């Protein structure tokens, strides 16, 4: 029977207390690449969350039957299979977004968050807890992506979800978009500010020398 306290811990912990990006510094590369628009950030969040949750679930189901010498290969095969399914669904039902995400959906296979949860948690825990752990870490990853995507799209183009929020000078409005926010380095600074803000609110997360 699933432990409700453990489920609550693994589901809510990664949101702020043990965020994959802000605290563990995992999955940063894709966070730089897919956050120029809020829409792509949300789709990437959904994709990573589903892959992490179901890969952890399936790996946990067969964890006692996986030889230690090939466990990484088995994990990669399961993760890769799920990523292919997600990629094909995106191509079929959201082709434009799939084109914008480009190779980054495929690179979920090597995402440290997905591999890390499979190895560190799913190989040692029951299926339900592992599934919820995957959901929690996917959402923790997504919180940062959505915040970064929100700031970059709004300041970089004056839009959200492609809809004009701040009328630009070119269209007779007052706002002058800052194109620097559409470049990857801006995401570094925004993520850095998020990490600073989170650790200011939660001093216990600051590494001790």
From Swiss-Prot:
Catalytic activity as recorded in UniProt: a ubiquinone + n Na(+)(in) + NADH + H(+) = a ubiquinol + n Na(+)(out) + NAD(+)
Domain of life: Bacteria
UniProt GO MF annotations: oxidoreductase activity, acting on NAD(P)H, quinone or similar compound as acceptor
Keyword Endoplasmic reticulum: no
Keywords from the named record: Cell inner membrane, Cell membrane, Ion transport, Membrane, NAD, Sodium, Sodium transport, Translocase, Transmembrane, Transmembrane helix, Transport, Ubiquinone
Compartments where located: Cell inner membrane
Cellular component aspect of the GO annotation: plasma membrane
GO biological process: sodium ion transport
EC number, as in UniProt: 7.2.1.1
Membrane topology (UniProt): Multi-pass membrane protein
Pfam entry (one): Rnf-Nqr
Membrane-spanning residues: 42-62, 70-90, 103-123, 131-151, 178-198
Subunit structure: Composed of six subunits; NqrA, NqrB, NqrC, NqrD, NqrE and NqrF.
PANTHER family registered for this protein in UniProt: ELECTRON TRANSPORT COMPLEX PROTEIN RNFE (PTHR30586), NA(+)-TRANSLOCATING NADH-QUINONE REDUCTASE SUBUNIT D (PTHR30586:SF1)
Similarity remark: Belongs to the NqrDE/RnfAE family.
Purpose of the protein: NQR complex catalyzes the reduction of ubiquinone-1 to ubiquinol by two successive reactions, coupled with the transport of Na(+) ions from the cytoplasm to the periplasm. NqrA to NqrE are probably involved in the second step, the conversion of ubisemiquinone to ubiquinol.
Classification via NCBIfam families: nqrD, PRK09292.1, PRK12405.1
Annotated HAMAP family: NqrD
Record protein name field: Na(+)-translocating NADH-quinone reductase subunit D
Originating organism: Yersinia enterocolitica serotype O:8 / biotype 1B (strain NCTC 13174 / 8081)
